[in-house]
Amino acid sequence: MEARLVLGSSSERRKAVLESFRIPFICVSPDFDERSIVYSGDPFEYTKELAWNKANVVRSQGFSDALIITADTVVVYKGEVFNKPESEEHAVEMLRTLSGSSHSVITTLVLMQNEKVLSASENTQVSFIDIPPQHLKTYVRSFSSLKRCGGYCVQDGGGLIIKQIEGCVYNIQGLPIKTLNQLLMEFNISLWDYLV
């Protein structure tokens, strides 16, 4: 591969998803305050702006020639955006709100190299079971909810609360593989060449 590949993310899940391929990359945490971007009502534009800002921050950290991958993921329910919870109580409230209903998980990817910038979004529908109220705090403490958009995860036992998923499961983990590969192919890279 000609270009150095940089995953601009502090997410362990995104890193783990990309590590499932043999593609060489480094992981750089973008020093960017996501709270500086105000949600204006369009989750696709919101996640695109966040991912674009992350990519620019990584580029400014000495990776100007690298192929930079950044992403931002949000949960959307009845027009409201759920990011990472700010406290255990906030996570419990998020899960209580989402319990027994369906919501969208939207991730926008931005790939940036020099002046070439591409982006694409993925939308996955997730339905929750009616989560027993007495298990909400246990769930939050068991699955590092404060590090997860919407306060939940799909991997390991975290999927216990999920009734149905329509769309890309990797999107819920923050790195939709099919969409990522489509963008990488525009830079003459295919994940098919890096299967383990």
Curated annotation (Swiss-Prot):
This chain belongs to the protein called dTTP/UTP pyrophosphatase
Say what the protein does. Answer: Nucleoside triphosphate pyrophosphatase that hydrolyzes dTTP and UTP. May have a dual role in cell division arrest and in preventing the incorporation of modified nucleotides into cellular nucleic acids.
Gene Ontology MF terms = dTTP diphosphatase activity; nucleoside triphosphate diphosphatase activity; UTP diphosphatase activity
Active site location: D72 (proton acceptor)
NCBIfam families xref list? maf (TIGR00172)
Q: Where is this site: Important for substrate specificity?
A: R13, T73, Q155
Q: Where in the cell is it found?
A: Cytoplasm
Q: Which cysteines are joined by disulfide bonds?
A: none
Top EC class for this record: hydrolase
Matches recorded under InterPro entries = ITPase-like_fam (IPR029001), Maf-like (IPR003697)
What is the protein's species of origin? Chlamydia trachomatis serovar D (strain ATCC VR-885 / DSM 19411 / UW-3/Cx)
Question: Mind telling me which HAMAP family this protein's record contains?
Answer: Maf
CDD domains the UniProt entry points to: Maf
